[in-house]
């Protein structure tokens, strides 16, 4: 039997994710949830939903999250961590409010949250904290006893997140034809966001020049590129690029776009490209459509050999990293001296999001941070 690990004062872990449709009839209602309050016509949502309809109306994120749940529960059981794991989403079933209600009914009073976003940004962190505040407000209106909720820190530079991506890039390089392999360029891909949102990401002292969002991605890209060089003996050129832009064309977003980048690399004589989706925990629709479908078609049009490396997904090392993050935060809550595990130059991220971190355009209550209205 494994030694019993102590997660106290926490009595549950909540996997908090974006959500996605499970069939064609779910696509438009799901997109209505995503775009709530923006007044987008249903016909326009049907056009946007074509990405999902190409895959039978099913988002891959749901099965990815189910696999991650299984991996977490397996890892926790094998290592003596008695901590039940629940799952709730922002935009589709299982909805966050329903899951929190279930957790309260099960007697959970101290909850840790793992968001399926590794980096600092409004949509990847604070918006989830706003969702938590909304859910707590709903439970409060029902007269339920509210649990205390904390959120695990950003884990972009934890070895259990970085090392599986290194393996993925090395495998993708090996899949390229031998004659182009050593000259291959690595395009580290992440979700584009408005430059104003990037500049405001992270704590106030990190605002500007892309903010924490860009700096964290660059740190991970360097870590992976350095590790790939050590593994292969080849110093592959690389660049951080962006994908999945949306919104009004006059609003500046982070660039270059992956398809534009492929055109530029081909024109510069690059013989092959590996696309490494470091901004995504698992194979979201943005990975399957924007990279595997759209960007891959662009590469074929250009005659440019291209491979897409694997996301972390339910890799056992990532499940072990989550266990490590849980124990780290639990020890810190108990007042113990804890040494956080982090690679790169930026160090471990904060446990508690400070006031002014990743601000919204219109201020809203956000739980699990220094500015939380819930104790």
Swiss-Prot record:
E.C. code: 4.99.1.9
The UniProt entry lists the main location of this chain as: cytoplasm
User: What is a GO molecular function of this protein?
Assistant: metal ion binding
User: Which top EC class is given?
Assistant: lyase
Q: Which domain of life is it from?
A: Bacteria
Residues annotated for Fe(2+) binding in this entry = 191, 286
Q: Which GO terms describe its biological process?
A: heme biosynthetic process
Q: Which UniProt keywords apply?
A: Cytoplasm, Heme biosynthesis, Iron, Lyase, Metal-binding, Porphyrin biosynthesis
Compartment(s) of residence? Cytoplasm
- The UniProt annotation places Fe-coproporphyrin III binding at 59, 128
| Matching Pfam families | Ferrochelatase
The record, for Gene3D superfamilies, names: 3.40.50.1400
- Catalytic activity, reaction form: Fe-coproporphyrin III + 2 H(+) = coproporphyrin III + Fe(2+)
GO cellular component terms, alphabetically, are:
cytoplasm
- Matches recorded under InterPro entries: Ferrochelatase (IPR001015), Ferrochelatase_C (IPR033644), Ferrochelatase_N (IPR033659)
Q: In which pathway does it act?
A: Porphyrin-containing compound metabolism; protoheme biosynthesis
Q: What does this protein do?
A: Involved in coproporphyrin-dependent heme b biosynthesis. Catalyzes the insertion of ferrous iron into coproporphyrin III to form Fe-coproporphyrin III.
Q: Into which family does the record put it?
A: Belongs to the ferrochelatase family.
Q: Under which name does UniProt file this protein?
A: Coproporphyrin III ferrochelatase
Question: What species is given as this protein's source?
Answer: Streptomyces coelicolor (strain ATCC BAA-471 / A3(2) / M145)
Q: Which gene encodes it?
A: cpfC
């Amino acid at each position: 039997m494994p030694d019993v690990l102590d997660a106290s004062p926490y009595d549950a872990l909540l996997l908090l994710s974006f959500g996605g449709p499970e069939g064609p009839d779910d696509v438009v209602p799901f997109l209505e949830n995503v775009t709530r309050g923006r007044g987008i016509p249903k016909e326009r949502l049907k056009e946007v939903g074509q990405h999902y309809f190409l895959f039978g109306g099913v988002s891959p994120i749901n099965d990815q999250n189910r696999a991650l749940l299984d991996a977490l529960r397996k890892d926790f059981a094998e290592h003596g961590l008695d901590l039940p794991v629940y799952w709730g989403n922002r935009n589709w079933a299982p909805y966050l409010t329903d899951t929190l209600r279930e957790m309260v009914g099960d007697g959970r009073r101290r909850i840790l949250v793992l968001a399926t976003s590794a980096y600092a940004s409004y949509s990847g962190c604070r918006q989830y904290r706003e969702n938590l505040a909304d859910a707590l407000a709903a439970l409060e209106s029902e007269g339920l006893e509210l649990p205390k909720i904390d959120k695990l820190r950003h884990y972009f530079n934890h070895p259990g997140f970085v090392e599986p991506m290194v393996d993925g890039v090395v495998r993708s390089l090996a899949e390229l034809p031998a004659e182009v392999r050593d000259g291959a360029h690595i395009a580290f891909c992440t979700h584009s966001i408005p430059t104003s949102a990037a500049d405001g990401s992270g704590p106030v002292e990190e605002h500007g020049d892309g903010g924490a969002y860009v700096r964290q991605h660059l740190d991970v890209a360097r870590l992976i590129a350095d590790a790939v060089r050590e593994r292969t003996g080849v110093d592959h050129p690389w660049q951080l690029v962006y994908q999945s832009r949306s919104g009004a064309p006059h609003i500046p977003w982070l660039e270059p776009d992956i398809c534009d980048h492929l055109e530029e690399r081909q024109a510069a004589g690059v013989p092959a490209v590996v696309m490494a989706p470091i901004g995504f925990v698992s194979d979201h629709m943005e990975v399957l459509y924007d990279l595997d479908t759209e960007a891959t078609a662009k590469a074929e049009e250009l005659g440019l050999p291209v491979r897409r490396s694997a996301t972390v997904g339910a890799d056992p090392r990532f499940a072990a990293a989550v266990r490590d993050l849980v124990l780290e935060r639990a020890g810190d809550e108990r007042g113990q001296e804890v040494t956080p595990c982090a690679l790169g130059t930026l160090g471990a991220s904060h446990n508690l999001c400070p006031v002014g971190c990743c601000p919204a355009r219109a201020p809203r209550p956000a739980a699990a941070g220094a500015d939380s209205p819930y104790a």
